[in-house]
């Protein structure tokens, strides 16, 4: 195995059911085994799972319901607990804990909620817990639509700072035409950018239980690749597919990342106008510039301006020189209160904390 990597695995309804009307538990057992093997080798695994609606339908005995949002939410409300219970039972066989995260698109669009979701997800990973993520279908409205969990998996990959995103489906990958109706269709092994020509070959879901098709997987791949994350669309029934992806073995269709996640993030930080400014002491200046360290509250001398958590701020030395730009973990009022204090005092001063640093080194670019 190579060095530790973070992998987000999205499992569609067609994979979890095997195209039937019920969850294929034997197949899910095998997928969990593959994930557990990687987890034991030191890799960080995130699961984005579909199947709540299918699980609810199965549990209720396949009721005849109208094809409405309310019916889908009813089934999701019943099925979500059954689904997460299954994941918990199977991972516990390997002594692995899971943590459930139910998200909506609104969690991604609001800065504060985005940062909270990111911090929660990364805290789970840091503690060797496998996050299991799903759309909060029981309360979502417009979110229940084609491809929601495909796109959600791309956003989860960004939140996790993932190296790879694996979209498992009932197809081998992306083909030049629909292989179910065209025997001449060929597998596209490598993609270096999603364009209109590529979108035109994407087909639709045929399982009737899921909410995603190949076109939405292209959308997800496009988003992830632009964020610097390699994305693979592959068959969930291929033996050892998850391990193969982590080993770099060619499977399915690989969408090559356009830049590394860190490069993309630092490019954004460099270009964003600072929302405020902080001045730091000589010790903090040396730590950041010479050792590439994060900025701790202890090193902050003053805070200028009003800004929110998650905004880019300018960091200056005692002579007023602009030495770095970075994303603040705390808003301006909080930074004023904890400036000059040790990180261990943050919770006592604020009544909460978002970690021991004011600006993390991964969220900073020195000038």
Curated annotation (Swiss-Prot):
GO terms for biological process: L-proline biosynthetic process. Its main location: cytoplasm. Substrate binds at residues 50, 137, 149. The keyword DNA repair does not apply. CDD domains: AAK_G5K_ProB, PUA_G5K. ATP binds at residues 10, 169-170, 211-217. One of its GO terms (cellular component) is cytosol. Its EC number is 2.7.2.11. Pathway: Amino-acid biosynthesis; L-proline biosynthesis; L-glutamate 5-semialdehyde from L-glutamate: step 1/2. It catalyses: L-glutamate + ATP = L-glutamyl 5-phosphate + ADP. It is found in: Cytoplasm. Keywords: Amino-acid biosynthesis, ATP-binding, Cytoplasm, Kinase, Nucleotide-binding, Proline biosynthesis, Transferase. Residues 275-353 form the PUA domain. NCBIfam families: proB. Belongs to the glutamate 5-kinase family. Catalyzes the transfer of a phosphate group to glutamate to form L-glutamate 5-phosphate. This is Glutamate 5-kinase. The lineage of its organism: Bacteria, Pseudomonadati, Pseudomonadota, Gammaproteobacteria, Enterobacterales.
